[in-house]
Amino acid sequence: KVPARSVESRILDIAGKLNISDILNKYPYQVSGGQKQRCACARAIINNPKLLLADEPTGALDSHSSQMLLSTIQSINEQLRATILMVTHDAFTASYASRILFLKDGEIFMELRKGNDSRSDFFDKILNVLTMIGGGQSHVC
């Protein structure tokens, strides 16, 4: 059993990282769609999972909230050595990954690995692949 003090500390830490501290005592009908999405992410990461499945995790978020969420997911990956399988159509979101599989017509079209590239350089490579395969017609995983 986890001590209550430890649970409370973890909740406050994650809520702070996802900018949802001010809604912890609110009912679902009192919060926005983006806040609900960030709460769902908090639920997914609260127990330090070894595998995190993220399907369009930034879909309902504004750019600031998206960046905060992606930074949190990235720190989970680094600190907990968690594997994160993320599906996204957004090149910026994909640039936070270390490895990307591009799907086209239900098959793997290409793989990119970040390696030692900066996120900005990796983002440019992602855009180049998307241009090569027709932009929005593919999925980035």
Over which residues does each language-model region extend?
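Conserved ABC ATPase "signature" region
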Residues: 5-22
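Conserved ABC ATPase signature
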Residues: 27-31, 35
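Hydrophobic anchor residue at the start of the ABC signature
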Residues: 41
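A short, proline-enriched helix->beta-strand linker immediately N-terminal to the Walker B motif
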Residues: 46-50
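Catalytic Walker B motif of ABC-type/P-loop ATPase nucleotide-binding domains
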Residues: 52-55
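Helical segment within the ABC ATPase nucleotide-binding domain
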Residues: 67-79
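Conserved beta-strand-loop-alpha-helix hinge in the C-terminal portion
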Residues: 107-132
